[in-house]
Every structure is written in structure tokens, then in C-alpha cells.
């Protein structure tokens, strides 16, 4: 199996091979965008992410493990444009307790919380975070990026990522009265993506 970086490099002379990268990562980019801005915006963000990546592939020179964070960084930049859609989705989630929205990222905590009452509180608490804190915690929790990957995606030092995630966790804990996303790692800095259930 080719690494992501090998695919990017080969696509410079054989553009059709870039489709392998799309096949490998498009579902994750779509899910991340849908969780942040809803299904309607997710299609556009996913498509535009891969268009921007394809057009910028000649300039990519990072390590193999940086391709996924590079793609999520592009998606995150595009989502900034869709911030209003994300804000509307989180406000709607807060208003209606999550009914009528996919909000897949909240499903992981359903075992800990009452879906009708706390899902709306979670949406409101996420919306209340500063955008840079919300971006960091959602890249961590919903895009499953490491702290290094988030630093690559957002273009900030890893220490800044740690601070933003720590602040977001503290604010969420204070607003909600329980820990959200705290049990995802125990060493205050995921070094590898969390294992996916098949």
C-alpha cells in the first residue's frame, strides 16, 4: 500500500493517482465538515478541500504523516468561511436537543449523558467556546488528529494546541458539570490517532 505522501508525489506526474488520496480520506473529511457545519455545507467543503489539495500538491513537501493533517487544515480553513453555518447548526442543536441533526460526534458521549437535555447543553457549550478553542477540540475529537496533526492543520505550535484544548476542556467541564472529551487520552497529548472500531 502506498503512503499518502507517495500518492501526492506520484500525482504530480500522473494526476489521476490523486484519486487514491480522495478515496482514502474523503469520508473522514466529509464527517468532520458535517459535524461542524451540517450535511449541506459538508459536500462543498469536502469537494473544495480536495480541489485545493490537488491544485497545491506540487507545493506539499511534508512528511508522510502530515498529509492527513494537511487535508484537515485545508478543510478547517474552508470551514472558517462556513462559520456562520456552523454557528447556526450549534445554536439549533442547543435549541432542539439534537433532534433533526446528525451531530455524530455527540453520539460518542451519549452513554454518559441524557440525550434530550444534555445534547442541547453540549451544543450550546461548544458554541460558547472561542472559535480557536472549538476548532482545536473538534479537530482532536471529531477529526481524530494528534496534537502534532492539529498543529500542522492549524499552523500553530504544539504548545498552543495543548493550551487551546486544555482551555476548551476546562470551559466545557465548567459549563456542563461533567468532563467531555477528557477520557479520549490520559497523557494530555495523544501521540497517535485513537483506534477506530471496524
Each predicted region: which residue ranges?
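Short, charged helix-capping/linker segments at alpha-helix termini
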Residues: 12-20, 30-48, 62
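Residues within the DNA-recognition helix of helix-turn-helix
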Residues: 25, 164-167, 171
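Amphipathic, Lys/Arg- and hydrophobic-enriched alpha-helical face
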Residues: 22-40, 55-56, 126, 178
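Helix-turn-helix DNA-binding module
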Residues: 124-135, 143-160, 174
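Structural recognition of an alpha-helix C-terminal capping motif at a helix-to-coil junction
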Residues: 44-51, 65-77
Amino acid at each position: 500500500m502506498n503512503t499518502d505522501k507517495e500518492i501526492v508525489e506520484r500525482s504530480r506526474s500522473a494526476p489521476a493517482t490523486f484519486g487514491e488520496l480522495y478515496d482514502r480520506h474523503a469520508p473522514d473529511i466529509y464527517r468532520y465538515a458535517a459535524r461542524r457545519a451540517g450535511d449541506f455545507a459538508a459536500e462543498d467543503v469536502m469537494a473544495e478541500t480536495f480541489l485545493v489539495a490537488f491544485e497545491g500538491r506540487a507545493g506539499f513537501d511534508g512528511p508522510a504523516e502530515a498529509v492527513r493533517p494537511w487535508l484537515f487544515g485545508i478543510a478547517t480553513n474552508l470551514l472558517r468561511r462556513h462559520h456562520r453555518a456552523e454557528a447556526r447548526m450549534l445554536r439549533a442543536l442547543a435549541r432542539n436537543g439534537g433532534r433533526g441533526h446528525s451531530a455524530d460526534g455527540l453520539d460518542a458521549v451519549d452513554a454518559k449523558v441524557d440525550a434530550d437535555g444534555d445534547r442541547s447543553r453540549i451544543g450550546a457549550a461548544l458554541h460558547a467556546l472561542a472559535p480557536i478553542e472549538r476548532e482545536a477540540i473538534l479537530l482532536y475529537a471529531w477529526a481524530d488528529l494528534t496534537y502534532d496533526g492539529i498543529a500542522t492543520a492549524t499552523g500553530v505550535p504544539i504548545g498552543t494546541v495543548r493550551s487551546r484544548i486544555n482551555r476548551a476542556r476546562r470551559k466545557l467541564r465548567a459549563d456542563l458539570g461533567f468532563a467531555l472529551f477528557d477520557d479520549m487520552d490520559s497523557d494530555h497529548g495523544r501521540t497517535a490517532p485513537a483506534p477506530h472500531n471496524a
